[in-house]
Every structure is written in C-alpha cells, then in structure tokens.
Amino acid sequence: MAVLPAQQHGLLVLNKPQGPTSAQCIARVKRLGQKKIGHAGTLDPMARGVLLVLLGHATKISGHLMADGEKVYLGTLRLGTTTDTWDAEGSVTATAPYDHVTPDDIRREVENWLGSTEQEVPPYSAAKHQGQPLYKLSRAGRETPVKTKTVEISRAQVVSCDLPSATFRVTCSSGTYIRSLAHSLGMRLGCGAMLTELTREYSHPFGIDEAHELDAVLAEPERLPERVIPVTRALPHWPKLRISAAQEAGVRNGMIVPYLPEAMAELPFAEGLKAIMLAPDDTPVALAETRIVNAQPVWTVLRGLWSQ
C-alpha cells in the first residue's frame, strides 16, 4: 500500500472527467491524506475540464481566486430540444422544429452574448432561495423563482456548426451559467436548445494544459507533492511583499506592517492595494491589504496563511 503524502498547501489543477460531481472528485483527492481541501468553481457532472483544487492553507484564498477569475469554456448545444435542467442531463420538456434556423443565425446569436448581460439562473442550480438550493426545490416539485444575475462575456465565437448542433467558445466572468447561454439562444430562435457538452478550458490563471487527470492523481499518491502549485502562482497579479522574520512573528500576532515603497518596487501607496506577504524563505505568510491606520500607510492582514 502506497504511503499517503502529508497535508499539502497549494493548488492541484485537476482535469475533471465527465460524470462525477465536483464534490465527488474532491472527496477522492481527500483520501490521499488531504484533510483540509476545497475547490474554486464548481463544474456540473456532465462537464469536464479545469477544476482548481485547494489544499491546506490555499483553501483560504478561494474567495479571491474566484473573484479574480476569468474562465474559458468550449460548449456544444443542440437545437430543437428543451429540458428542465437546460442540458442533456435533464428530462425533455419540449421539442420544436428548427429547420428555419441557419448557421448565420447561430453566429449572430452567439455574438449577441458579448458584453455585460443579465442571464437567468437555471432552475436546477446551487443558487439559493430562502436558504434552499434551487435544485432541491426543483427535485421536490416545488415552484422555483426566476433569478437573474449579471455576467460579463468578453469573447464569444462559433467554432463549428452542423445543425442541429453547434459548438462555441466563450470567455466569461466567474459564475456564468453556460447552460443559460444555450437555453436563451434556443428561446430567441424559437426552437429551444440544450447544452450537450461542456469543457472548461481555462480557470484563471490555469489552463487545461496544466491539469492532471483524476485517475493519474489517485493512482500515484506519492507524486501529489510535485503536482501541487504554490499559492503565489494562484494570484499572479498580486505583488509579493517580503517581510523580516521579526515582522512575520508580529503579523502572526496581529501586528500591522508599515508601507515602504522601496519594498514594493517603488509602487506608490493607494488604499486597497493587495499583496502576498512572504517570509524570508519565500513561504507565503498572509494575504495583505493597504490601509491608513493612525494617519500612517500600513499593510493589514486579510487572511493568514498559517495553521490556526
């Protein structure tokens, strides 16, 4: 029996297979001695692709990772069929002819996704109403309220079109429902549509070329440490602030650190700047933010990256 690795602290970029839920994938990795584990951005069971698994201290950066994160998806939709989940996993609720739709219609509608838009949240989703996930209300046969959210689509293009199917690629903000894009396209074209395939190709700042297959990770637990990426690479746009050993000890006890421009490559002070504090040996110590305290510019700790 292979020796399980110690608790890791960093990110594992996983290529989630089609079938299991994100939670099931996390549970399998957890069996490799990883008691403290989470992820940034759920994928539906039918979807595959980049799933960012957070290990140890990296679980504390989840909110920042998801807030900063642009995502790229490759999806395929099929015209003429509508389901209750808006994808191929659900039960068919309606069918309609689609022979009036042309490839140019598809391209036009996909281009219309661009920009900031309000999209309807799928009735089968983890979004909550009065504390209950919508999917639980839907499965119980209860009426689900129509919820909308604002999303940003920065790129959208048709990759191929072989009606009734069309494959597209979108670059979007975190939290975008690709099922909703397919569903709304079908509604606008008057024939309905469902999502049949979905691959997340990129979840900022990692692409699928850096992702590890789940089966390989599980089969070789001894290689987990070499597959884990440091926290500093997860937030590439955050400056690195190296502090002294004395400051590190103080930070762990709630002390603030003076803002010194020379420590930040002469970056001028502004409130709300964020950085990753590093110990003298480059170990991540904390996520920090600039503030004015007692009329002085300082760094304060957003989240400590040490064991509590």
UniProtKB/Swiss-Prot annotation:
Active site residues of this protein: 44 (nucleophile)
Bilayer-crossing regions: none
Keywords, alphabetical: Isomerase, tRNA processing
Single Gene Ontology BP annotation: tRNA pseudouridine synthesis
Record-listed E.C. numbers: 5.4.99.25
Entry annotated with the keyword Transmembrane helix: no
Gene3D superfamilies: Pseudouridine synthase
HAMAP family linked: TruB_bact (MF_01080)
UniProt-recorded name of the protein: tRNA pseudouridine synthase B
Species this protein is from: Nitratidesulfovibrio vulgaris (strain DSM 19637 / Miyazaki F)
